Amino acid sequence: MITLHMVVLPFLITLFLLLIIKFLPMNVPDKEKLSPYECGFDPSGSARLPFSMKFFLVAILFILFDLEIILLFPLAWALNSQSHSNAIILASVFVIILTLGLIYEWLKGGLEWTE
């Protein structure tokens, strides 16, 4: 009975959804759908503007350190358990590795904005 619910049923649902997608009408792109929308005005320039690679690198670093904070949030629940030292050691190692990565990026000039 468990096999039916855990293997066969998801397979049948997936097959059903694939069949529905096969028979739905396709969206055919044309010139109007692919053009940028500018509130009824004629486009003044290209919609694909280049951006600075420095901005891209800083954005990636921001995402990495934002994820660090998210991964450290469960530390509060880990400190409620009996093994405080294990949680603190793991969090410290995690922060030290990310700090070493930040120092490496700083020394390589990845945080310098001037071009």
Swiss-Prot record:
It catalyses: a ubiquinone + NADH + 5 H(+)(in) = a ubiquinol + NAD(+) + 4 H(+)(out). Belongs to the complex I subunit 3 family. The chain crosses the membrane at residues 1-21, 55-75, 87-107. It comes from the Eukaryota. The keyword rRNA-binding does not apply. Its main location: mitochondrion. The keyword Mitochondrion applies. Core subunit of the mitochondrial membrane respiratory chain NADH dehydrogenase (Complex I) that is believed to belong to the minimal assembly required for catalysis. Complex I functions in the transfer of electrons from NADH to the respiratory chain. The immediate electron acceptor for the enzyme is believed to be ubiquinone. Keywords: Electron transport, Membrane, Mitochondrion, NAD, Respiratory chain, Translocase, Transmembrane, Transmembrane helix, Transport, Ubiquinone. It is a multi-pass membrane protein. GO terms for molecular function: NADH dehydrogenase (ubiquinone) activity. InterPro entries: NADH_UbQ/plastoQ_OxRdtase_su3, NDAH_ubi_oxred_su3_sf. GO terms for cellular component: mitochondrial membrane; NADH dehydrogenase complex. This is NADH-ubiquinone oxidoreductase chain 3. It is found in: Mitochondrion membrane. Its EC number is 7.1.1.2.
